[in-house]
Amino acid sequence: MANKTPKFLIGIDLGTTNTVVAYADMAKALSPENCKIFEIEQLVAPGEVAKRPQLPSFRYHPAKGELKENDLLLPWSDKLNDDLPTIVIGELARELGAKVDGRQVVSAKSWLSHPQVDRSASILPWGAADEVSKVSPVLASASYLFHVRQAWNTSHPDALMEHQEVVITIPASFDESARAFTVEAAKRAGLSEILLLEEPQAVCYDWYARQGNHAQAQLAKIKLLLVCDVGGGTTDLSLIKISKAKDDSLALTRIGVGNHLMLGGDNVDLALAHTVEQKINGDRPAKKLSTSSLSQLIQQTRKAKEKLLGNNPPENTKVTLLGSGARLIGGAKSYLLQQQEVSDIALDGFFPVININEQPVKRRSAVVEFGLPYAPDPAVSKYLAQFILEHQSACHDAINSTQPEEIATPDALLLNGGVFNSPALNERAQKVLSEWKTGNITLLENSRPDLAVAQGAVAYAKARRGAQLKIGGGSARTFFLALEKTDSGQQAICLMPKGAEEEQEFMLKEQKFSLRLDQPVKFHL
């Protein structure tokens, strides 16, 4: 029988492109070394199960008879309630989706934060044919967490995941509805007691834990840190003030959070897909790709991007656009994507070197053909500039500026997200920030940006137990309760101010409330 007393601290990075799990054994000292990546069992080929450090956040809905029952066997037999009877999750789902048109669910995390759709409705795969079974963004997210939970429980039958302390990370820019849908997905996956942590903070926790006793010395001359987390579907920005407490100990306080920005590696993949489509068609008039065909092409351009922007890249790699229907193979067309083309799009299109006063282009709508409301301007650099300018008051305060007429900029940068596995993009982001600052900007080392968030979630759980420094800053937003309109207009009561710390209570002693009996009421926050 499983012990319900927590034995492990578990951090889950529920990513747009990959899900990662890290953990620490509570029976051991909660030192930085006490943190491991949990390798997740998953299908990697039909009938073949293997452990991987990441679970690709992809689902594949096979056609009837496409895969044999034995091809889909996992080390566990439990199924997620209300899910489809036949699905593939993880590496095999990613590979099948790159070959078969219109049956892959991608970017479920981005859909969780899409306010213009019903996130509980069965809409994914987006744009798929009527005969393809669909699921909601909430259920898709729950299925990844359920898979992770089953893999963990199979490996730890005496310490089930639902009985451990679990921290799930989310973008700092997630609004309350997106956070609530994440909690709902976790509950549907069997994880009813979880903690949420903002991803940029998780990155900071991981960095601090890895530096150990050297952290204080490395941050001694730094006053303002920018955390730039560019994932598959979102860009997450946070400002961290670094100061000394009264006892001369280090104090880290989050002082700024960026708006929700649906701009990330997926956008690069989409731009590359359009480039390949145009090159293949040449001057011939071509029918616009269906959503499902575009999805299949994007999976291939994603792989090409990672190869051509990685270490020791080849000069080119082949990308194939499959035909459809009876012409699936015969109608296939290929293009040799050059390393320089990818570099031009990823660096100059998404991380151009600009003046800090250059603002993002504002349009009525962004790239929405793939279903998601992408940011209207593809240049991450411009949103970085906008974010820093919008937080000038906090920036000046953090660096103790005596020249308010000058633009205050961060003096340190911490990069995260799979995008920054590319040395070229890493260097470009640093160059962009350096152009805005007199003197060099300090780049804090992050050797595994694909694992840092999950590891940071574990470090946060340790910090809650006093094992390391805890980042302050509290709530990123102020919460008001809207009251009924009066002759003097709309009024509201502040329930929780921005900066409120975890478990801090606020008593509304001066406010009297009236009760309305036997009538339905709504509370507008």
Per-region residue spans from a language model:
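Gly/Thr-rich phosphate-binding beta-strand-loop-beta motif of the actin/hexokinase/Hsp70
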Residues: 2-32, 103, 108, 119, ...
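Acidic, glycine/GT-rich loop-and beta-edge segments that sit at the periphery of enzyme/chaperone cores
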Residues: 6, 14-16, 219-220, 278-329, ...
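Phosphate-binding loop and its immediate beta->loop->alpha context
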Residues: 36-187, 270-317, 326-362
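Phosphate/ATP-binding catalytic cores across multiple sugar-kinase/actin-like superfamilies
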Residues: 143-159, 206-216, 349-409, 428, ...
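Conserved phosphate-binding/catalytic loops in two-lobed NTP-binding clefts
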Residues: 189-202, 373, 429-456
